[in-house]
Amino acid sequence: MAAKEILFSDIARSKLTEGVNILANAVKVTLGPKGRNVVLERSFGAPVVTKDGVSVAKEIELADKLQNIGAQLVKEVASRTSDAAGDGTTTATVLAQAIVREGQKYVAAGLNPLDLKRGIDKAVASAVEELKKISKPTTTSKEIAQVATISANGEESIGQRIAEAIDRVGKEGVITVEDGKSLADELDVVEGLQFDRGYLSPYFINNPDKQIAEIESPYILLHDKKISNIRDLLPVLEQVAKSGRPLLIIAEDVEGEALATLVVNNIRGILKTVAVKAPGFGDRRKALLEDIAILTGGQVIAEETGLTLEKTTLAELGQAKRIEVGKENTTVIDGAGDAKNIEARVKQIRVQIEEATSDYDREKLQERVAKLAGGVAVIKVGGATEIEVKEKKDRVDDALHATRAAVEEGIVPGGGVALIRVRQAIRELKGANADQDAGIKIVLRALEEPLRQIVTNAGEEASVVVAKVAEGTGNFGYNAQTGEYGDLVESGVLDPTKVTRTALQNAASVAGLLLTTDATVYEAPKDAAPAAAPGGPGAGGPGFDF
């Protein structure tokens, strides 16, 4: 085991604080509409230019081990905030640095760190309650666009694109961000339920221009097993043929004689059919088949439910207005399922989302909700170079998460004003002793810091602006984009309540831990390798190589 070194009290804390400051100083220059860029080196390929706080934080590893511990603690603030709210990472970092800086002064003066932390926690709890009081729900597409614009560093086109996507797929819909192929941003919307399985034979294609199979008003057969024997299918095929409507078969697999017969009948025009594999695997496949059944008003033909292919009737088949089947995707448009059953299924999946322990499971369940309740939109980010696309894509991701947070918990005035306004509630707070009162003062001072940094990045005098905003009330604040004072809600400078709340809580949590740290244990640096002795390899005379 490697030898360890231990540092105590002020010496340990001062080294940790140095690390906090190094990371925070690199991250905070990105804050606000006039935030600066940070260039990140890459071992391979072009460097990355970004204004995304968490991207900058993740890149930082310091050579000094103790400083690096401090930097990693603040990196944790940014990561936690990003995971919970998807945005607000720079605000959280700025708040954490301010709380640590102010707290260090009091600890150095001999105040009890634990009482300071109790005061900090009390002030933050009061600030969060006040934030909830001044928060208002997002009701219009315009407000959603404004929130997205602020999060995207003031780029209106991104805000408009995200608002349009939410309009098209609804608040429950899935919106994903991809690299585009052109200079402009594009929005692709998939109506209905889409899953990643295509036709089992190209002979099902009836639209050669698009290379897809399109069928109108089809019946939909859902089966959880392989189909290889055509005799199992004959009864249901005969019933569908009599109805004169096409048939979509979704099963674990369709192969051999069964697939060949379907292809021949399709080519001859006897029965228009398309066969695709069921999406997913194992239990997830069963759940997805059940989703499709509920959406289309059919039933999954499975032994568990006591249904067999031979005895299947038209009543057990699903229906839809249209089906589009490509090489890799199948889209069910306007399923005939009962709205109440679909709503009940969505509620059931939402319960599973709350109980899910892994991010992967939660993401897949959220996709299922979107496919049942809304739709899927893809924002394709355009740009002239790969570097520009990557930088813009980071901002679109932030903006997307911010709008989700705004829909969830509402909005507050942006530009650091909400944190200035909650100071009023904290001023009246009293701790159990003088040290706790000092903890409350730490938070009071730290709440100014995001506004100070936004103003500094905009090239203005921070103290003057903070004083003027503090004199005002309600939504009055400083718009760094225009350099003017006014009602920030009216001018569209908004922040999601969840982002502001999460940033403050996470910053206070990690800063409190750092202030109450009294010892650090770290691996002792290894001694430098001894210099090579004279007369070693290559020590011969000129022109000789031993």
UniProtKB/Swiss-Prot annotation:
Report a single Gene Ontology molecular function. unfolded protein binding
Q: Chief subcellular site?
A: cytoplasm
Which spans of this chain does the record mark as coiled coil?
none
Q: Which domain of life is it from?
A: Bacteria
**Residues holding ATP:** T30, L31, G32, P33, K51, D87, G88, T89, T90, T91, G415, D495
Q: Decide whether keyword Ubl conjugation is in the record.
A: no
Keywords on record: ATP-binding, Chaperone, Cytoplasm, Isomerase, Nucleotide-binding
Which compartments does it reside in?
Cytoplasm
For this protein, what is the EC number? 5.6.1.7
Q: Which transformation does this protein catalyse, written as a reaction?
A: ATP + H2O + a folded polypeptide = ADP + phosphate + an unfolded polypeptide
Asked if Endoplasmic reticulum is a keyword of the record, the answer is no
List, alphabetically, the Gene3D superfamilies matched.
GroEL, GroEL-like equatorial domain, TCP-1-like chaperonin intermediate domain
Task: Give the UniProt entry's GO cellular component terms.
Answer: cytoplasm
The alphabetized list of GO BP terms reads: protein refolding
Checking Pfam families in the record gives:
Cpn60_TCP1 (PF00118)
Name of the top EC class for this enzyme:
isomerase
Question: Subunit info?
Answer: Forms a cylinder of 14 subunits composed of two heptameric rings stacked back-to-back. Interacts with the co-chaperonin GroES.
User: What is the stated purpose of this protein?
Assistant: Together with its co-chaperonin GroES, plays an essential role in assisting protein folding. The GroEL-GroES system forms a nano-cage that allows encapsulation of the non-native substrate proteins and provides a physical environment optimized to promote and accelerate protein folding.
The record's comment on protein family reads: Belongs to the chaperonin (HSP60) family.
Q: What is this protein called?
A: Chaperonin GroEL 2
Its source organism is: Burkholderia cenocepacia (strain HI2424)
Q: Gene that codes for this? A: groEL2
